[in-house]
Amino acid sequence: MLRLLAFLFVVFFFAESAFAQLERERVEEDRDVELTFMAPRNINLYTVHHLSGGELHYSIMHTFGEVTGGARNLWGIDQGANVRFSFEYGITDHFSIVTGRSSMDKVIDLGTRFSLLRQTVSGSMPVSVSVVPLVGVNSSSLDFLDEPYSFNERLNYSVSLPIARKFSDNLSLQISPIAAHFNRVGPEINIANSTKNSYITAAFSGRYKVTQITALSWQYIPSFDNEVNNPSNLAFGIDIETGGHVFQMFFTTSQALHEPYLAASDNGRFLDREFRFGFNINRLFGIR
């Protein structure tokens, strides 16, 4: 009888251990995929790279003038600058608040970012999905606008839906449908069509990791505006990760730096050398 009890105890013990191991493996396999992108921005576009609760992302985004300015203007470095400063703070692991300011049209914006779905290692969820609604106000002076703009007329809105998949340790691809609206437009606003208020596009972007700290990146934002002969936005760059910093250097055909203006921007033609140099500096802080 004692031998039987001992045998049953051993069987139960090993069965329990095996079951626990299977549970641990199941949890491990179903964990979220990490580092789909190196930063919350890939060149100009928001990505599905979400902040953890208590994490702060600070970025400086900068584009210069077109390289067609030649050596006299240091291939655009001396002219046509657009600068954007932005902060994003993770309230939870799935929700963050965003604010920023762009020198183009002196737009101050406020928004949120929700992580709706997360790609899992097991494949039970094949993609990551976020949604980013933004509202901005043109704070330009009356001298710049030439005529009075009410507060409501100065507002612009956008919503983007980044959908991304990390196909391997090296390759990540993303599509971002974007809808944008400007309450009032005119020749004084830095967009391609001074008579059109609403815009819809679908931006494509991706990254390919070359080494542990570098990756190649790209974006393509087609122009669906048939009223003006506006080329699509095209950009290529390189990302360099150094601890808590991610440096991004790129060439782009657009001067715009955030979603509503990216959807409506006046773009150059890459093959005609109508592109410009730009860079982003991304810094992550844990402040909780």
Where are these regions (language model features)?
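Substrate-binding/catalytic groove segments of enzymes
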Residues: 210-217, 226-228, 245-248
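Transmembrane beta-barrel domains of Gram-negative outer membranes and organellar outer membranes
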Residues: 21-148, 155-159, 164-183, 199, ...
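Sec-dependent N-terminal signal peptides
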Residues: 4-13
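Short hydrophobic "helix-edge" motifs at membrane interfaces and signal-peptide entry regions
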Residues: 4-5, 82, 202
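Sec/Tat signal peptide C-region and signal peptidase I cleavage site
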Residues: 14-20
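A mid-sequence, solvent-exposed acidic-amphipathic segment
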Residues: 175-222
